[in-house]
Amino acid sequence: TGAPEEGVKGQSLFIVPKYVVDDSGRLGERNDVVVAGLNHKMGYRGTTNTVLSFGEGRYRPAGQAGALGEIIGREGHGLAYMFHMMNEARIAVGAGAVALGYTGYLRSVAYARTRTQGRPLGNKQPDHPPVPIIRHPDVRRMLLTQKACVEGGLALVLYASRLVDERQTAPTEEERSAAALLLDVLTPIVKAWPAQWCLHANDLAIQVHGAYGYTRDYPVEQLYRDNRLNPIHEGTNG
């Protein structure tokens, strides 16, 4: 809705139901909105993602062409409503990125403690038994890098989550206002930083597993595929 020259100020938010609902709340005739196809994704394969088609003429609700939708809130405020939802969703994206990164880190530590390969650094005895790869300095470097990324991301997410509560529940108006202002600054950081660096941690988790990390015998490849979405959705990283 709105004039074209209004730009984003002219955008409104609508809900378009599958079935038209009458004033009594009963489901009526079929609305002209259909699933046009499935998106075949790199990750998150346990969730369905679709392409929707509106008003293509397959159904004619109320005998007229086009899909019927109900406006949500005030006309021309659709983008503002979307950002109200997305800002807290961005914190959830950061939390999801941390969870996937942390899982990969823990898997890496467990694997590095049991996988044996090579001799200790500086040992030249050919008959020395192989040692767990966690004893190799470069493997430790990769593990510590993962730990720094995921624990830093976790601290950031927990701090932002506390600010969400304080924005509403702090005892004074001054404290509530300060929490809200700080959250405005931190929200894009909480989304973008864990999304980038916890994905890097997942990449290192694959590297620690070696060739096995590239197979589906171990879950680290799935963790990377699932986490790859987080730098993209709810506000794309640069």
What are these regions (language model features)?
Residues 1-238:
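Internal glycine-rich alpha/beta core junctions
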